[in-house]
A protein has these predicted regions:
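Aromatic (Trp/Tyr/Phe) and Gly/Pro-enriched flexible surface segments
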Residues: 24-297, 301
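Sec-dependent, cleavable N-terminal signal peptides
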Residues: 1-24
Length: 301
């Protein structure tokens, strides 16, 4: 074997190494929630009164970070991640222990409790801010992921998350008359582990629990990505056992008025098995309303 042939395998490894590194989800935890909202999440809007878990969002928090997943299976290239555990636990592959962070805080949220049918909520990550829409709609793109898939599909208790919008013209059942924007596409059904999954109840669940939330729950399998239950060696896979496809949260709003959004996620029933929300960078936007600037010309007799 000549020297050129001997060098070939080493050269291939050198070339392949950056590709392998780029294929994995990258999560950073160096910015405050306020910085992440303003610099990463928002697209052309300005946030005010940014609060995380009831306090000014001016400290770096392990439950909030930035991510780059251009070559992973999240489906969103980059953005903000919010988790019931340490956001670093999202990094795959998904072929080892569960992402299962037990946090020292006991944060809860009444709207998540309502979504979880009165179950206790812990390890909550609650990010709230105000904004003024520049158009008559507001929208953003997201993916929900959880370690509770597939075992706890159709279980009596599931981790909960929601996007609670309040402000002029909004009337809903949550705090400050908010509505939840985290809905199964084309429906008014909240996105949960029991409404978006593979269509099969887990061994800790019963199909009746899923059917009680949505009689057509099995049809929602089209919005689910199976991540192979801790048995996926693919380096592009995130660590959670299942995740949704990319979805869009949207609402009608009044241009120029002040609105509040609360992005919240929490562990239900216990503090085990992390869940997370991936929010697309720059997608939180309110397209400006078109103005017809054409002047009417006087008619000529």
């Amino acid at each position: 074997m000549n020297n050129a042939m001997k060098r070939t395998p080493a050269l291939l490894l050198i070339i392949a190494a950056p590709l392998l590194a780029c294929a994995q989800l990258v999560v950073t935890n160096t910015q405050t929630p306020a910085q992440l909202v303003q610099n990463t999440l928002l697209g052309g809007l300005v946030a005010t009164n940014i609060i995380f878990n009831g306090a000014p969002a001016t400290a770096v928090i392990t439950q909030v970070g930035a991510f780059n997943s251009a070559n992973s299976n999240v489906g969103i290239a980059s953005g903000l991640i919010l988790s019931t555990g340490n956001v670093a636990s999202a990094i795959g592959p998904n072929n080892g222990a569960f992402a299962n962070t037990i946090l020292p805080n006991n944060t809860t949220d009444p709207d998540l409790v309502l979504l979880a049918n009165g179950q206790n909520i812990g390890d909550a990550a609650v990010l709230r801010f105000n904004f003024i829409p520049t158009g008559n709609t507001v929208s953003f793109r997201f993916v929900f992921a959880s370690e509770e898939y597939p075992v706890y599909v159709c279980a009596a208790v599931n981790d909960a998350f929601g996007f609670f919008l309040s402000g002029p013209g909004i009337s809903g059942p949550y705090q400050n008359n908010a509505v939840n924007l985290a809905l199964v596409p084309g429906t008014g059904t909240p996105v949960t582990i029991n409404t978006v999954n593979s269509g099969t109840a887990g061994n800790q669940g019963a199909a009746a629990n899923c059917a009680a939330l949505d009689p057509n729950w099995q049809a929602n399998a089209q919005f689910f990505v199976n991540n192979m239950d801790n048995n996926n060696p693919d380096p592009t896979a995130v660590r959670y056992n299942g995740l949704t496809t990319v979805m869009t949260a949207t609402a009608q709003v009044q241009c120029g008025q002040v609105y509040s959004i609360k992005i919240a996620i929490g562990d239900a029933g216990d503090d085990e098995y992390d869940s997370a929300i991936f929010l697309e960078a720059g997608s939180f936007s309110s397209p400006s309303m078109a103005v017809d600037a054409t002047a009417a010309l006087p008619s000529v007799a």
